[in-house]
Regions:
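Bacterial N-terminal signal peptides that target proteins for export
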Residues: 1-8
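N-terminal signal peptide c-region/cleavage motif recognized by signal peptidases
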Residues: 16-18
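Exposed acidic/polar residues on beta-strands and adjacent loops within beta-sheet cores, strongest
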Residues: 20-157
Length: 157
């Protein structure tokens, strides 16, 4: 009985440690999109490994939101695969096609710490990926790389 109890406690400690480790690399951030009267919530996939998985972009309308209730009116969302951890989410002016883009950056788990980024634009009822870059140096200008990717995409049409 003593051995059984010890094994059970060890297993519980392992599970608790593993659950805590999964939370150490979680990411959740709310980003205001005032010109659209929206707010976006970017979060990494729950219970996924730190180094790979997914993240979600959920968009809510704030057009009729009371103070403190800006995530009540869900509009749309997308899931995106990730290679690395989500590092940040912010808005950036990426030019005429994406004047208030939602940018999500990731950092690889490997020794290089390479950076990736995706840019999204929203409409009243949709969120759309407009540019994506991967394998950037850790100190790269993410906004410039996304602007360049947008330009290449435009010239390919």
């Amino acid at each position: 009985m003593k051995h059984c109890m010890r094994a059970l406690l060890s297993a519980a400690a392992f599970v608790a440690t593993h659950a805590q480790a999964a939370d150490d690399c979680s990411f959740a951030k709310k980003v205001d999109l005032p010109s659209r009267r929206q707010v976006a919530v970017v979060s990494s996939g729950a219970l996924e490994p730190c180094s790979t998985g997914s993240y979600a972009v959920r968009v809510y309308s704030t057009a009729h939101a009371a103070p403190g209730f800006d995530t009540d009116d869900y509009v749309t969302g997308v899931l995106h695969a990730r290679d690395g951890t989500v590092a940040d989410a912010f808005t950036a002016d990426l030019g005429a096609r994406a004047p208030q883009a939602l940018v999500v950056t990731t950092r690889s788990a490997g020794s290089g710490g390479y950076v990736g980024a995706q840019a999204y634009v929203t409409t009243p009822r949709a969120v759309r990926l407009v540019a994506s870059v991967d394998g950037l140096a850790p100190d790269a200008d993410v906004k410039a790389a996304l602007r360049q990717a947008l330009g290449k995409r435009r010239s390919a049409r």
